[in-house]
Amino acid sequence: MSGGSRIQLLSPRLANQIAAGEVVERPASVAKELLENSLDSGARRIEVEVEQGGVKLLRVRDNGGGIAPDDLPLALARHATSKIRELEDLEGVLSLGFRGEALASISSVARLTLTSRTADAGEAWQVETEGRDMTPRVQPAAHPVGTSVEVRDLFFNTPARRKFLKAEKTEFDHLQEVIRRLALARFDVGFHLRHNGKTIFSLHEATDEMARARRVGTICGPGFLEQALPIDVERNGLRLWGWVGLPTFSRSQADLQYFFVNGRAVRDKLVAHAVRQAYRDVLFNGRHPTFVLFLECDPTGVDVNVHPTKHEVRFREGRMVHDFLYGTLHRALADVRPEDQLAAPAAASEIVRPSGQQVGEFGPQGEMRLASPVLEQPQAEPRQSFTPGSGAGSGYQYQYTPRPSQPLPVAETQAVYREFYAPLDGTAPASLPESQGDIPPLGYALAQLKGIYILAENAVGLVLVDMHAAHERIMYERLKVAMASEGLSGQPLLVPESLALSQREADCAEEHAQWFQRLGFELQRLGPETVAIRQIPALLKQAEANRLVQDVLADLMEYGTSDRIQAHLNELLGTMACHGAVRANRRLAIPEMNALLRDMENTERSGQCNHGRPTWTQMGLDDLDKLFLRGR
């Protein structure tokens, strides 16, 4: 602090401009504050008109309750609000705005005109302010019941801030995204947007389930709904509903992720962590999941006053919320089966499908076996085995038996078909299923393509399966079940590893010692800032134990839980499954292919391999007709 400076009060104008730096970053920030005010007023129709990306003009007009004439000057004052009266009101606030800062901040960096009329008023009133002159001017005006706020020349009096604005298209894209989020949060409100005199969209009130789905399709694109799972789960005072995209409908950017807490759009680290865990082993590397999800909970259990723009929230029971989100999404993705995805006739946009029953089956060692072989198998080559190390806990050994790569003769293939479709007693003639309802979701195998793909026919059309990717997922899920049932064996260290931590980390390690024990670790506190690692999971003996424990402790302190150990274990199991899965260029008999299809139908997450790639795709009859220009 310099010796010549004296402490003095800031002028109201300067104080508001400083506050505007937190609230008003760009035209999209202004739109967010004005639209939230409109929603809080009970509006059922909101019109937004924009010029030059919102820099020259941003006008928001609603049919809400309006503002009384005597309250108009107060509406532009700092910390003037109708939402709360006492501190206790803040603990359970449901309104989107409550601080009373937005209009004052906006009016300090732009030319603002507010016109409003209440239902019991004979006429409307208007108040104007300009950045330099913070004194509001009130006068009569013509306006229906509701409120209009017009913001012109944003940052006209702060050139330094204006320099940081991007191109018109960029600013408008940000503004449009704000409106999209609010339109998803409030299906009961109509939103209408115009830019430079052109109508961008008109979203009418969505009062039923079909209308809500249409709005989601308009905002997120029709492809999202076709590749999304509707969910609605309620437990322990929490309700999660909405749509979660299938792993095959992922994005290169996290630009189709909408999460709302009690109607408020949020971007929260705890939520992001739970979603990331749920998609952990079904998403391709570098891809992002898609979702539109709504969490409803007791407002007193959520603190919304932790960020200037209210984008972040804090949950009183963060661990419970995290586990609820993760469990709900994880189960929803795991429960997907082909029959769920093929309930309706396929359209062109429904070609890519995830999958997830049993004529034959895969044996526990990963080799395919049939309930009753229909043709004599050639002499197998010596078995190759994959063994992930030796020692305690490494008893998982998975083998596969490669088959000769020569294709079956045509006559032998026909014999396979006759015997496969023949009744077990051999008395009735062979026949295909009599109705579409008898055909399994993934149908019956027709042929193998290039030793890589299985071509099958189901009630919809053709199915193509990547046999290695599909078998890899089946093996992986069985390995996880086996590990969960047999438990994790630990391997004691001859020389315990000493780990230097902060006191907070050491406290966390001591508090979660039993949790670590269940995962195969044994930690012992040696001092205020020292912990010894005495045992590690046998399957992770090649891992860097010190680094892993530190990363897990960081997660535990941040989120109250961690999936890092499980992620390491799953990575190892995934490698084992990959080595044990049937390889490309291995020729399969028709019954073997059908065995794989039935296992896919019974396996969780079988729509993606362990690396997130799709395992099968559907091509309906309509798609084939289009290829050959039939019906035109």
Swiss-Prot record:
Where is the region Disordered?
376-397
One GO CC term, this protein: mismatch repair complex
Q: Which InterPro entries match?
A: DNA_mismatch_repair_CS, DNA_mismatch_repair_MutL, DNA_mismatch_S5_2-like, HATPase_C_sf, MutL/Mlh/PMS, MutL/Mlh/Pms-like, MutL_C, MutL_C_dimsub
Q: Name one GO biological process term.
A: mismatch repair
Assigned keywords, A-Z: DNA damage, DNA repair
What is this protein's function per UniProt?
Answer: This protein is involved in the repair of mismatches in DNA. It is required for dam-dependent methyl-directed DNA mismatch repair. May act as a 'molecular matchmaker', a protein that promotes the formation of a stable complex between two or more DNA-binding proteins in an ATP-dependent manner without itself being part of a final effector complex.
The record's similarity note reads: Belongs to the DNA mismatch repair MutL/HexB family.
Which HAMAP family does the entry link to?
DNA_mis_repair
By what name is this protein known? DNA mismatch repair protein MutL
Q: Which organism does this sequence originate in?
A: Pseudomonas entomophila (strain L48)
Gene this chain is encoded by = mutL
